[in-house]
Structure formats: C-alpha cells, structure tokens
C-alpha cells in the first residue's frame, strides 16, 4: 500500500510522460493539468529549476523582470515586462519571480529565479517524481513508448522531452580542444587573477565569462570565426545581450580586451599553460597566443539519449532534434519537445531572426500551445473556442496587437488566429505557430502577430487567408509601440474587409 510520503508516479503506464522539471517541463505540466490531461512528470533532478541552480556562472540572468512596469502586476499584459515568471490563467500564479527579487537589479539572480520556479511548482501543486533518471527509450509495435529509468520502466502513448539544452558541447574538429575546460567547468574568478585568458566563443556564455573576469584577468581574448552578433544591432534576443557587452566596449576602445574573428585551428598544452593557434577570418592572417587559461564557451546540446536510434533526426551539429511547428518529431509521431529544446522548431525566421524559444519568455508560450495541441490531437478533447461577432474582430485583434505577450515575446513565430466560416461563424482559434498557419492552408482566416522589420522597426503584421491564398499586410509602427490606436484599427478593418464583409 502506498504511503503518503511516497514519491508520485511509480513505474507503470501513463497517457503522457513529461521528462524534465526545469521551467519548460513545469510550464507544460501546469498547462496540461489545467486542461485535464492526465500525465506524469519524471526528472533526474532532486528539485525543480533545472540549470538555474548552477548557471549562469556569474549569477545574473540576461532576461529582465521589471518589478515596476506601466501595467498592473499579475495581469496578462505584465508578462510583456516579466520575462522570467511562468505563465498561468490563475492570477495567484502570475508574476512570481518579482516576489523574490531584492531590488538591486531588474535582472534576477539565479537564486531569485530558482525560488520563483519553486514557488510556482508548490503553489500550483505540480507533482514531480524527483531523482528518477531517464536511461533509455523503446518504441513498441503499437506506437507507444517504453521509458527506462533508474526507478523502473514506464509506458506511455505520448512522450514529451523537456530536459533542456544541458549537455556541454565542443566542436570535434579542433585538435586539442578536449583538453580545454568547458564553460560549465569554469573556476572561481580568483583562479584567473593576473592570468591571460583565451575564450573560444563569442555568444552570451563567452561574453558572460569575459565580463565576470574583467576585474581579475590580466588579458582576455575572445575568438570565433564569425563577427559577434549583438542584440542591440540585430534586434534579436538570440544574439549577445547588452548585459554582457562591457568586454566588447573594452575591445573597441582599446582597453586590452580583444574580440577577434578567427578560426581556432589547434590548442596545445605547454609548460606554463596553453598555446592557441588561429587563423583570422575578417582580417586574414595567422595568429598565435600563449595564454594561462582557455575556456570553451562553445554552447550546449540536447541530451537525447537513444532517441536518434528510434528515428528522431537532429540538426545544428546534432545539438537539436528536428521538429514540426507543433514541436513534434517529424519521423516519430508521439514524441514532442518542450522548454529550450523547442528552438529546434525554427519557424519562418523572418529577416534571419530566430524565435525566442531558447529562453523562458518564449518557450512558456510554446508549452501552453503544445498542451492544447496535444489535448486536441492526442486525446481527442473538444476544447471550447470563443465565437465572435463580425464587429468584435477588429477591436479584439487590435487589443491583442497592443499587448498580447505571446505575440511580443514570440515575434513572427506565434500568432492570434481567427477563422471565418460562413456556416460556423467567426471563431477565435487561439494562439498558434505562424508557420503552421502559413503552410497548412484552409478556409478564410487571419493571423495577427508582431514583427521587427529589416530596419529594426517593431510593427503589427497581419496574414489574411482568403480564397486559399495568404497575403501579408504590414500595419504602421508607432514610436511608443501603441498598436491599439484608432488609426491602427482603421488599417486593420481595411485589411480584414475581404473576409468579414
């Protein structure tokens, strides 16, 4: 007989299993529970919060939460200013991270982020089987899955992998890089005092290490083949964030830090440290560095275990699984992904900008959309959808464009979709992946989203499907990002006239 303190979800059969208790897994579990989808959550961790218990190494996140914002806290619109709390329709579960922030920065510390996630898990009553390591997976003849764990075998018809991009990754084609500590093995800053430090990689983890070592290192060099992509220039959260750009300013002002475009050709151990051989790319030429320490800030991959043996394909140097717009493996139906892994569903990538799915502010909405998709398609649940009168469509879409956090955080990736049918009427289909809307086809409908144009202007964009063809209509921007004005409503009404008349 089970005891009250026994861990939940003993080995057995469950309709759906979520692997992982980081923010992606917790968000998905909460969303599934709200819809009434029975599932189990398994994790190797001993507590929720995943990588935030260890990283970022220098404590502060690069995503902000603004305790004081021009909108009321615990509202949907406030999520626009709170990039770190999980999302819920329950006002008591909204905006939990700012509760734990001490006011010294609007970038939460990892401890503040951890406490926010723990509070969400506890207050939402999300049961998790901790200390249960995923060890392997089999696909059965009936299409179901057997998940081998340290606690025994589990069976399910739907499997969602939310283990994060947590596997340290290094490029295999650089001789000697196996001797180089990865970002996750970074020592305490004092260990780099008066040392020459070479950092392989110029993305956020590389700039984070460089920024943290500025008061300690004698000299810092960051290098990778391509120029650094900066968020303030690319208008993309996937680029190096301004939070860590002091080393870049040090470089451009000649302060002794160097940010170089160079391909690393070899790393050798020497009696006093390392010798790094490189070849300039933007400015061709051989380069050689004698340094005391080297750090490989070369990123992470997804620990997929044996999923590739089941047919799950990968890309990005095998670091991400390929996914449909609804985050499902194209080759293995029934295997889905949540959390930061969902950046493997690329979307339209307009103007070369990726989605916001690598971080909480983006993938929390992916998880909510995924929960509804799974409920409808895997469990045949008939979820209610709101009907609209014709004269309600323009005000409703204008309001969404003015402040729906899903559209602002997942620009050109998620969209509010409204379908128009002569028999069924006008229906709010909900938030959907924009790529799905554009590629799938169907009856008359509209998808409204926010996009940042090639010139960096943020503006509303509406995709109208009429007579089987999709037309893209760009509305005017606004210097104060107010897209609910009378002029925007007028433009919106004109765009929608063909399907609403």
Where are these regions (language model features)?
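Rossmann-like nucleotide/phosphate-binding core characteristic of flavoprotein oxidoreductases
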Residues: 1-15, 23, 30-45, 54, ...
């Amino acid at each position: 007989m089970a005891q009250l303190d026994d861990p939940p979800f003993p080995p057995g059969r469950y309709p759906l299993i979520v692997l992982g208790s980081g923010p992606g897994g917790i968000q998905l579990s909460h969303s599934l529970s709200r819809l009434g989808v029975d599932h189990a959550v398994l994790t190797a961790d001993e507590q929720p919060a995943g990588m935030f218990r260890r990283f970022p190494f220098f404590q502060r996140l690069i995503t902000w939460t603004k305790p004081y914002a021009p909108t009321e806290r615990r509202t949907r619109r406030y999520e626009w200013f709170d990039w770190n709390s999980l999302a819920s329709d329950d006002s008591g579960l909204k905006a939990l991270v700012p509760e734990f922030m001490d006011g010294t920065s609007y970038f939460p510390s990892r401890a503040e982020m951890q406490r926010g996630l723990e509070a969400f898990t506890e207050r939402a009553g999300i049961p998790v089987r901790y200390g249960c390591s995923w060890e392997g997976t089999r696909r059965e003849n009936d299409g179901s899955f057997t998940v081998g764990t340290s606690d025994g075998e589990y069976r399910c018809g739907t499997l969602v992998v939310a283990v994060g991009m947590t596997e340290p990754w290094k490029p295999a084609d650089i001789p000697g890089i196996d001797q180089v500590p990865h970002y996750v093995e970074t020592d305490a800053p004092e260990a780099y005092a008066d040392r020459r430090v070479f950092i392989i990689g110029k993305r956020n983890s590389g700039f984070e290490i460089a920024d943290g070592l500025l008061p300690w290192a004698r000299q810092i060099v960051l290098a990778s083949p391509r120029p650094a992509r900066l968020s303030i220039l690319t208008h993309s959260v996937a680029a190096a964030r301004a939070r860590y750009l002091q080393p870049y300013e040090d470089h451009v002002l000649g302060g002794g830090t160097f940010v170089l475009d160079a391909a690393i050709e070899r790393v050798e151990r020497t009696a006093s440290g390392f010798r790094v051989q490189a070849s300039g790319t933007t400015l061709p030429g051989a380069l050689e560095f004698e340094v005391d320490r080297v750090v490989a800030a070369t990123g992470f991959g997804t620990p997929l275990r044996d999923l590739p043996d089941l047919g799950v394909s990968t890309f990005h140097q095998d670091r991400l699984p390929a996914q449909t717009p609804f985050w499902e493996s194209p080759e293995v139906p029934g295997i889905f992904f949540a959390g930061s892994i969902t950046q493997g569903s690329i979307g339209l990538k307009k103007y070369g900008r990726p989605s916001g799915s690598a971080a909480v502010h983006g993938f929390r909405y992916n998880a909510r959309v995924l929960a509804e998709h799974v409920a409808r398609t895997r469990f045949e649940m008939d979820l209610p959808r709101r009907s609209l009168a014709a004269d309600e469509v323009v005000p409703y879409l204008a309001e969404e464009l003015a402040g729906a956090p899903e559209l602002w955080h997942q620009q050109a990736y998620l969209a509010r979709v409204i379908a128009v049918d002569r028999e069924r009427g006008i229906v709010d289909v909900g938030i959907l992946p924009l790529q799905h809307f554009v590629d799938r086809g169907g009856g008359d409908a509209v998808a409204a989203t926010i996009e940042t144009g090639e010139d960096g202007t943020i503006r509303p964009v509406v995709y109208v499907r009429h007579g089987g063809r999709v037309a893209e209509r760009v509305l005017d921007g606004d210097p104060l990002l107010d897209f609910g004005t009378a002029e925007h409503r007028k433009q919106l009404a004109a765009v929608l006239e063909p399907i609403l008349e």
